[in-house]
Swiss-Prot record:
Heme a3 binds at H393. This is Probable cytochrome c oxidase subunit 1. The chain crosses the membrane at residues 33-53, 74-94, 95-115, 118-138, 163-183, 200-220, 252-272, 284-304, 318-338, 355-375, 394-414, 431-451, 473-493. The keyword Metal-binding applies. GO terms for molecular function: cytochrome-c oxidase activity; heme binding; metal ion binding. SUPFAM superfamilies: Cytochrome c oxidase subunit I-like (SSF81442). It comes from Rickettsia conorii (strain ATCC VR-613 / Malish 7). One of its GO terms (cellular component) is respiratory chain complex IV. It is found in: Cell membrane. Its main location: membrane. The gene is ctaD. Fe(II)-heme a binds at H79, H395.
């Protein structure tokens, strides 16, 4: 072999240094770490945006943003897109998925290391495009749903919405490539003796999520491409004057959008299964039922999309079907909730930070699920659609659901990733500040919604002022908690104690706890053999 090949061959056998290690990285651990850092950064930005419009909504009068209501809508749009595509998906699916799936199945790395590299680096230009769009032609004030005619040229002349569309194209491509990589890795690179039904539930959750992404993301890509041609090339997919229909866009968007919310939460389900099993010192209750529940959630999630559209004039039969289908999703979700509770039942439970976040997740996600059952009624949704009741519902499942699972996973695995263990008391303080802050933010929104306050409005009658003030105070507390979390990370990296191979004791029995903390640059060069 010539000199360059030899250099490249040997280059992979020691840890590279400097910026090249990160920019050119094909190592699943480094890429996972970059995903997590990116997600924390994006989460702070998205959180600051939400704080801005919560300050606007703290009292009636529309004074904080100086009556710039387009800016208000741009902040709403950016907050949603950042939190979904640049915070929670990169953290749970990209970050923990990339870092821990190979470790949990005993694989040396991902199946396609270079594909892994571009999956991450596509997110950076996507994020820059989205941020840039806010400064062009007044920004995209469409909401993350991009409904025409508001997102058409009539509603948004200028390049802002086009930039947002390209941003979504890139982040969708990133997710699809990452999904292909993870599916091939899980199917082809498991250690000898590890059958599919011996994999940890986190790996199963990532596998189901990857299939959802591959099936859902291209539909979003198609819908926003049609919107792009409507805006720039004279097509009329969504313009009634040319025989198009704006409701078609809603069908296409939500055919992606509903699986998307399960894409967001399923990896979190997997993390919670690992954490609760570890700190209950018991195997998870109903392992195969848990897998079945995730698969059923993934499947049914694709056939209930129009429950987001109960007020657009669907036929009576469609309303009945989508109401019933949506309610059915509560069954596999209930299986998971009760299996987690059954895992804890009779266990020898300890309550470190990851366990607190997992139990907090179960409580809050259940509240979000109950309001979801209420909203699944098309008759009740006539009243509640596009009110703050809906905002409260999906933030209880995403902001208090998926986010709590991300924190649970972070505190569970941070010692393994960094080699430094955080002081548990700091994590517990973070949990309680977050728990109080997010509940103070979103619980009053149920009352506002039931009283009739619409979503996505910058000003409101004085009757709604009280609960809005409470909600805004909660947002401030939550933002403080997020900054406190960043402090904990830096404090731990500088002053944390060295983390042992297995800081959690006998309950932690998956493969990653057999490695050093942090794991070596290359792991499982000789595959482990799984017994039993």
């Amino acid at each position: 072999m010539d000199i360059t090949t030899t250099e490249i061959y040997h280059d992979g056998h020691h840890t590279p240094h400097g910026w090249r290690r990160w920019l050119f990285s094909t190592n699943h651990k480094d890429i996972g770490i970059m995903y997590i850092i990116f997600a924390v950064f994006a989460g702070i930005v998205g959180g600051l945006f939400s704080l801005l419009f919560r300050l606007e909504l703290a009292m009636p009068g529309g004074t904080f943003l100086n009556h710039d209501f387009q800016l208000y809508n741009v902040l709403i749009t950016a907050h949603a897109v950042i939190m979904v595509f640049f915070m929670i998906m990169p953290a749970l699916f990209g970050g923990f998925g990339n870092y821990f799936v190979p470790l949990l199945i005993g694989a040396p790395d991902m199946a396609f290391p270079r594909l892994n590299n571009i999956s991450f680096w596509l997110l950076v230009p996507a994020f820059l495009l989205l941020m840039g769009s806010a400064f062009v032609d007044g920004g995209p004030g469409t909401g993350w749903t991009l409904y025409p005619p508001l997102s058409n040229l009539s509603g948004h002349p200028g390049a802002a919405v086009d930039m947002a569309i390209f941003s979504l194209h890139l982040t969708g491509l990133s997710s699809i490539l990452g999904s292909i990589n993870l599916i091939v890795t899980i199917f082809n690179m498991r250690a000898p003796g590890m059958g599919l039904f011996k994999m940890p539930l986190f790996v199963w959750s990532i596998l189901v999520t990857a299939f959802l992404i591959i099936l859902a993301m291209p539909v979003l890509g198609g819908a926003i491409t049609m919107l792009l041609t409507d805006r720039n090339f004279g097509t009329t997919f969504f313009k009634p004057d040319g025989g198009g229909d704006p409701v078609l866009f809603q069908h296409l968007f939500w055919f992606f959008g509903h699986p998307e919310v399960y894409i967001v939460i399923l990896p979190g389900f997997g993390i919670v299964s690992q954490v609760i099993s570890t700190f209950s010192r018991k195997p998870i209750f109903g392992y195969q039922g848990m897998i079945g529940a995730m698969v059923i959630i993934g499947f049914v999630g694709f056939i209930v999309w129009a429950h987001h559209m109960f007020t657009v004039g669907l036929s009576y039969n469609a309303l009945i079907y989508f109401t019933a289908g949506t309610m059915i999703i509560a069954v596999p979700t209930g299986i998971k909730i009760f299996s987690w509770i059954a895992t804890m039942w009779g266990g020898s439970i300890t309550f470190p930070t990851p366990m607190l976040f997992s139990i907090g997740f179960i409580i809050l996600f259940t509240i979000g699920g109950v309001t979801g059952i209420i909203l699944s009624n098309s008759a009740l949704d006539r009243v509640l659609h596009d009110t703050y009741y809906v905002v409260a519902h999906f933030h209880y499942t995403m902001s208090l659901g998926a986010l709590f699972t991300a924190f649970a996973g972070f505190y569970y695995w941070f010692g393994k990733i960094s080699g430094k263990q955080y002081p548990d008391i700091l994590g517990k303080i973070h949990f309680w500040i977050t728990f109080i802050g997010v509940n103070l933010t979103f619980f009053p929104q149920h009352f506002l919604g039931l009283a009739g306050m619409p979503r996505r409005i910058p000003d409101y009658p004085e009757a709604f002022a009280g609960w809005n003030m409470v909600s805004s105070i909660g947002a401030g507390i939550s933002m403080f908690a997020a900054l406190y979390f960043v402090f904990i990370v830096f404090y731990t990296l500088k002053y944390g104690k060295d983390c042992p191979n297995n800081p959690w004791g006998e309950g932690a029995d998956t493969l990653e706890w057999t490695l050093t903390s942090p794991p070596p640059f290359h792991t499982f060069e000789t595959p482990p053999h799984i017994e039993g």
